[in-house]
Amino acid sequence: MSQNIVIVGASGRMGRVLIEAVLDAPGARLHAAIDRADSGFVGQDAGLFCGRSSGVFISSDFIAALDGADVVIDFTRPEGTLEHMLACVERGVRMVIGTTGFDDEGKAAIRAAAGKIGIVFASNFSVGVNLTFKLLDMAARVLNEGYDVEIIEAHHRFKVDAPSGTALRMGEVIADALGRDLKQCAVYGREGVTGERDPQAIGFATVRGGDVVGDHTALFAALGERVEISHKASSRATFANGAVRAARWLSDKRNGLFDMQDVLGLR
């Protein structure tokens, strides 16, 4: 049976490719496409972003869209996602959350909501990125002495949070494998006379510019050699297809908090 899927942020960069991904996916049906009331796209066919007719017209009424919905896919902003999540909990509608930039309080709210509905919450829905997380765990356990860890990420000029959620997740995976607390060892950017590098540090460097979809590299640097594990995304479709896959996977999950490692069976 097809999953009735609601896309939030229909006119955004991710919303547009999510709509196309749902329209193309077997076992998925575009139930509603939601956008801001002032977006200028309300009332238009959601398929206009991919050059086809979908029969679903963009609306600003999120609550009405939940009637008959199975899953909401939300790649918007933290404050909006949390508001949508409350409505989903009240109506028993599952969620796929790709929004990044949540603070600790926001993440705690998601964990609490997952006690009532099924939620897939991930920093990145790309299959390749999630394989990269697995490789980083393996690498960190082997390169655990004498290797400095640095994470470099690049995104388009419009991205509003830094470092990216994916970069932070890479750091968490590596820190966990090394037995470190990322909150204690993370270094975000360097300037001026910094002194010698702390060998326990995990450094982050951020680049913003142009239309870069998403590049991430974890560098393990020792004296005499370095190992780099990289992922480069060339299309947002890879994230959208992963999110739709997650929505379909949620079909038999009444409640619980999951990520793409669960969806892909990588645990």
Curated annotation (Swiss-Prot):
Keywords: Amino-acid biosynthesis, Cytoplasm, Diaminopimelate biosynthesis, Lysine biosynthesis, NAD, NADP, Oxidoreductase
Catalytic activity: (S)-2,3,4,5-tetrahydrodipicolinate + NAD(+) + H2O = (2S,4S)-4-hydroxy-2,3,4,5-tetrahydrodipicolinate + NADH + H(+); (S)-2,3,4,5-tetrahydrodipicolinate + NADP(+) + H2O = (2S,4S)-4-hydroxy-2,3,4,5-tetrahydrodipicolinate + NADPH + H(+)
Pfam families cross-referenced by the UniProt entry: DapB_C, DapB_N
Keyword Endoplasmic reticulum: no
Gene Ontology CC: cytosol
Chain residues that bind (S)-2,3,4,5-tetrahydrodipicolinate: H156, G165, T166
Cited SUPFAM superfamilies: Glyceraldehyde-3-phosphate dehydrogenase-like, C-terminal domain, NAD(P)-binding Rossmann-fold domains
CDD domains registered for this protein in UniProt: DHDPR_N
BP term (GO), one: lysine biosynthetic process via diaminopimelate
Subcellular localization, as worded in the UniProt entry: Cytoplasm
Pathways involved: Amino-acid biosynthesis; L-lysine biosynthesis via DAP pathway; (S)-tetrahydrodipicolinate from L-aspartate: step 4/4
Main location: cytoplasm
EC number: 1.17.1.8
Record's keyword annotation contains Ribonucleoprotein: no
Amino-acid positions noted as binding NAD(+) in the UniProt annotation, renumbered to this chain: G9, A10, S11, G12, R13, M14, D35, G98, T99, T100, A122, S123, N124, F125
Enzyme active site: H155, K159
Molecular function via GO: 4-hydroxy-tetrahydrodipicolinate reductase; NAD binding; NADP binding; oxidoreductase activity, acting on CH or CH2 groups, NAD or NADP as acceptor
Residues where NADP(+) binds: R36
Domain of life: Bacteria
EC class (word): oxidoreductase
Function: Catalyzes the conversion of 4-hydroxy-tetrahydrodipicolinate (HTPA) to tetrahydrodipicolinate.
UniProt cross-references to HAMAP family, sorted A to Z: DapB
Entry similarity comment: Belongs to the DapB family.
Name of protein: 4-hydroxy-tetrahydrodipicolinate reductase
Gene, per the UniProt record: dapB
